[in-house]
């Protein structure tokens, strides 16, 4: 099988990822589990050539110099793929993450109603967090799409690499990729403030300068979407503040308290019937109570504020998991595996 056939097989089987690893058969991740494809093992040359053939010259140069590279590419009529090519102890390796060609709506994702409201906020910072593979990009794409369909404005995305490709609808959308279009997230963000955006998506807030510029953009009247790999709202606030030197922490807490609109922390859970996965969310909104807790460095008290904020659209992850179990969507065992307090999910 060539790479196109392998990727077509992967998409047909609803795999989120295709793994190629020298010395082993190709494998796919379906509903969270990695399974072998019933074909022969691939040697180093086969994996190397499959990946090398779909790279452009600049990607090959990065791969040869650094021994790894991130990029995205599209097979017309099939899907887009985010690729990480690397080297390992048996030879070449690569992972292809499937990015559906069609962007799902918030309704199709069965996202909480508050997500649509957050997508249309005039300013402030909305963070979607969670581990790798938790569906952050899918959620953000749906929120950007909702904004694009409902508001006349300028949406600017900065990604590494570009994943979901948006068409300009009511809004003008410009998508920039780190590498081909800009040297770094921080460079692109610095320029963004001079590019008349209403909304800026920062694919990954991975360093101090990017976080500082994203906060500044939110403070100066822009809607900023960003992602972090944190697992809860409280850890997200701590992560942002902890990046800064001690002398700046108090000022940063004040900036975060003023600009933070919401933190959505999500985790993917296997459906009880085994046919797929569903996202469970912790949702923290920037209420006056939450803003005060951030400003006063009382992050530990956030959880109880989220717990009691259901009427405002807030929920803890465990509250959402309880609801999913009650509705027979996921099993108690799956909820227990994802919960903050597993003891609340016996059985």
Features from the language model and the residues they span:
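Short, flexible helix-loop junctions that flank or precede catalytic/ligand sites
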Residues: 1-347
């Amino acid at each position: 099988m060539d790479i196109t056939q392998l990727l077509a097989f992967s998409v047909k089987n609803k795999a989120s990822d295709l793994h190629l690893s020298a010395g082993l058969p190709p494998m796919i991740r379906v509903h969270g589990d990695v399974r072998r494809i019933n074909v022969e093992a691939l040697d180093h040359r086969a994996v190397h050539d499959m990946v090398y053939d779909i790279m452009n010259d600049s990607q090959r140069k990065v791969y040869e110099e650094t021994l790894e590279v991130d990029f995205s590419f599209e097979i017309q009529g099939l899907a887009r793929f985010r690729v990480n090519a690397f080297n390992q102890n048996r030879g070449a390796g690569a992972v292809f993450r499937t990015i559906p060609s069609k962007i799902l709506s918030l309704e199709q994702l069965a996202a909480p109603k508050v997500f649509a409201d957050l997508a249309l906020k005039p300013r402030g910072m909305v963070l979607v967090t969670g581990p790798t593979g938790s569906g952050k990009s899918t959620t953000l794409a749906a929120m950007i799409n909702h904004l694009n369909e409902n508001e006349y404005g300028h949406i600017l995305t900065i990604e590494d690499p570009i994943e979901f490709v948006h068409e300009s609808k009511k809004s003008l959308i410009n998508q920039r990729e780190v590498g081909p279009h800009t040297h770094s997230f921080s460079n692109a963000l610095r320029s963004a403030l001079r590019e008349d955006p209403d909304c800026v998506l920062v694919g990954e807030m991975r360093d101090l300068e990017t976080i500082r510029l994203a906060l500044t953009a939110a403070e100066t009247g822009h809607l900023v979407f960003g992602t972090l790999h944190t697992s809860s709202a409280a850890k997200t606030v701590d992560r942002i503040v902890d990046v800064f030197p001690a002398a700046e922490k108090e000022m940063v807490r004040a900036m975060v308290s003023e600009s933070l609109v919401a933190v959505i922390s999500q985790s993917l859970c296997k459906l009880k019937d085994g046919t797929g996965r569903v996202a469970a969310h912790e949702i923290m909104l920037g209420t006056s109570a939450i803003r005060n807790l951030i400003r006063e460095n009382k992050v530990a008290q956030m959880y109880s504020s989220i717990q009691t904020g259901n009427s405002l659209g807030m929920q803890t992850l465990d509250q959402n998991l309880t609801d999913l179990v009650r509705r027979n969507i996921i099993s108690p065992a799956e909820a227990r595996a994802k919960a903050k307090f597993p003891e609340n999910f016996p059985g």
